[in-house]
């Protein structure tokens, strides 16, 4: 059993991401019909030795934790459908058909990446008998990384990619967090994630926690200490509501940013929140909580608490189960409701 200690309390990287997008972002409509405040190419780094980085300024336990772990285990499985996953959580139901099939599934690409049946002249491709090839003629990227960490840990080719351009061009929802790279420094294993699109209120906290678990799982099996998790988000955004509510931010974003620039202490975010709720039009029936700005301002007003610890059982990756991943000493603030923009 490997444990991530709970030594740190700082969630400054995520807090800085929120305030950066609020302070420098642009109002931006998008395909969902729910507008955003969007920033370009945002980055943060978290030291995983300071504890498991599950946010404490809102509650991510209970059904949220259940969904997070079962989703990650689904990735590990390599399944292209959600028939097993939907027995535990419905977070992918909106993008699947009645039989549970998806246009794109992360784990399918992690564990079963398509390999061309016929390559062009001069190209190098593994044959069907290669150790990382599956029986169906696909490539197991995760097995490749684990074996390479054992045999050549200083490799700079420890890349896992969930993006297939031809699939993404026609997929209902191509991968958001689409490629990640492991990197060894001394006896520490680090992980860098690149994400094309990141919902700061809902998605990014899940991504941070899930990839921190992934880093711990891989480090444990490869014999390394945990290092850092780094995250680059190309379009980092905060959803700000649909209809009149979303459009209001297009006309008043400068004023919001001016008020945020004057904040001197966490509790002053509540003053900005009160002004916003008084000034902005109410969200329409059926569109409640699509505006994530008030909830994030409430979250920003809260002092972070000590990070929890995470235990992961030392079992083969293929046997890893929900019960093998245990969160300890988690004492978060109350939950905050954010609606999902689909």
Curated annotation (Swiss-Prot):
GO terms for biological process: dTMP biosynthetic process; dTTP biosynthetic process; methylation. Disruption phenotype: Thymidine auxotrophy. Pathway: Pyrimidine metabolism; dTTP biosynthesis. SUPFAM superfamilies: Thymidylate synthase/dCMP hydroxymethylase. GO terms for molecular function: thymidylate synthase activity. It catalyses: dUMP + (6R)-5,10-methylene-5,6,7,8-tetrahydrofolate = 7,8-dihydrofolate + dTMP. Disulfide bonds: none annotated. It is an enzyme of class 2 (transferase). Keywords: Cytoplasm, Methyltransferase, Nucleotide biosynthesis, Transferase. NCBIfam families: thym_sym. Catalyzes the reductive methylation of 2'-deoxyuridine-5'-monophosphate (dUMP) to 2'-deoxythymidine-5'-monophosphate (dTMP) while utilizing 5,10-methylenetetrahydrofolate (mTHF) as the methyl donor and reductant in the reaction, yielding dihydrofolate (DHF) as a by-product. This enzymatic reaction provides an intracellular de novo source of dTMP, an essential precursor for DNA biosynthesis. This is Thymidylate synthase. The gene is thyA.
């Amino acid at each position: 059993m490997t444990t991530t200690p709970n030594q740190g309390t700082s969630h400054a990287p995520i807090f800085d991401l929120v305030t950066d997008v609020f302070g420098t972002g642009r109002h931006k409509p998008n395909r969902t019909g729910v507008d955003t405040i969007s920033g370009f190419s945002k980055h943060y780094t978290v030291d995983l030795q300071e504890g498991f980085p599950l946010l404490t300024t809102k509650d991510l336990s209970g059904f949220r934790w259940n969904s997070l772990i079962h989703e990650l285990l689904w990735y590990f499985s390599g399944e292209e459908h959600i028939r097993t996953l939907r027995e535990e959580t419905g977070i992918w139901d909106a993008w699947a058909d009645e039989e549970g099939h998806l246009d794109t599934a992360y784990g399918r690409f992690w564990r079963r990446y398509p390999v061309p049946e016929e390559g062009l002249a001069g190209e190098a491709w593994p044959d069907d008998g290669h150790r990382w090839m599956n029986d169906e003629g696909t490539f197991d990227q995760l097995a490749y990384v684990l074996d390479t960490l054992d045999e050549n840990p200083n490799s700079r080719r420890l890349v896992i990619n969930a993006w297939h351009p031809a699939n993404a061009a026609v997929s209902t929802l191509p991968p958001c967090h689409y490629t990640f790279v492991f990197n060894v420094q001394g006896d520490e294993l680090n992980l860098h994630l690149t994400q094309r699109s990141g919902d700061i209120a809902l998605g990014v906290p899940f991504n941070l926690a899930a990839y921190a678990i992934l880093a711990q799982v891989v480090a444990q099996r490869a014999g390394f200490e945990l290092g850092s998790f780094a995250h680059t988000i190309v379009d980092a955004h905060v959803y700000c509501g649909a209809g009149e509510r979303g459009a209001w931010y297009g006309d008043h974003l400068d004023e919001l940013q001016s008020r945020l620039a004057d904040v001197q202490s966490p509790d002053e975010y509540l003053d900005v929140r009160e002004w916003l709720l008084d000034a902005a039009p109410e969200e329409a029936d059926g569109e409640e909580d699509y505006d994530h700005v008030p909830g994030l301002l409430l979250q920003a007003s809260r002092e972070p608490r000590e990070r929890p610890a995470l235990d992961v059982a030392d079992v083969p990756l293929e046997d890893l189960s929900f019960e093998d991943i245990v969160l300890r000493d988690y004492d978060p603030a109350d939950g905050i409701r954010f609606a999902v923009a689909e």
